[in-house]
């Protein structure tokens, strides 16, 4: 997914590293409820299930997934990074 051309400064950052399903999505849901329309929530995760759970969450609830990427952290472990804009 490529980066959009608008301001991507997150209103909320969630560190869900080390948490397993369903906790990352539950935390995202709480953050989205507390934010206002157009706000961006940034999520960092280590659970591979977020790679399909977060896109489904966005589609189902009408939020925009601006960024979904994965990379290796300093310990060579896979990490997931998301930017979600509240619809």
Where are these regions (language model features)?
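Iron-sulfur (Fe-S) cluster-binding modules
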Residues: 1-2, 87
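C-terminal edge-of-domain segments
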Residues: 70-87
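Intrinsic-disorder/low-complexity, polar/charged segments enriched in Ser/Thr/Lys/Arg/Asp/Glu/Gln
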Residues: 11, 38-42, 79-81
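Amphipathic, hydrophobic secondary-structure cores in small proteins
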Residues: 22-66, 70
């Amino acid at each position: 997914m490529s980066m959009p051309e608008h301001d991507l400064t997150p209103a909320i950052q969630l560190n869900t590293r080390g948490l397993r399903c369903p906790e990352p999505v539950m935390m995202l849901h709480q953050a989205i409820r507390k934010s206002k329309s157009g706000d961006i929530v940034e999520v960092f995760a280590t659970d591979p299930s977020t790679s399909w759970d977060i896109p489904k969450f966005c589609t189902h609830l009408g939020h925009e997934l601006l960024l979904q990427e994965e990379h290796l952290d300093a310990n060579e472990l896979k990490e997931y990074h998301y930017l979600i804009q509240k619809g």
